[in-house]
């Protein structure tokens, strides 16, 4: 006798929420970079932005959190120091903006936007 497994929509929703709320889990995202035009400007954490440091802006991690960002078998560890990208871009699938130095460790700056995975270190 074969048994069919019936999954309730609420079960799927709960599973998705658990995965998304897991602070050490990873998520597929899009990333961009910001650089010279923000040099020296205050970030959301109160410090001044330096595009030469390995930092990132995100709404999804606390300030000071170290995250591993991976693209095409290359990874970089960055500290969350700012908030961004803008809410409109977050709604379009962009979850993190990298400093110029961090982005350059993953891809040529000319790409501008890359697919990444992000996980808490």
Protein language model annotation of sequence segments:
Residues 2-18, 23-121:
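Secreted/periplasmic proteins
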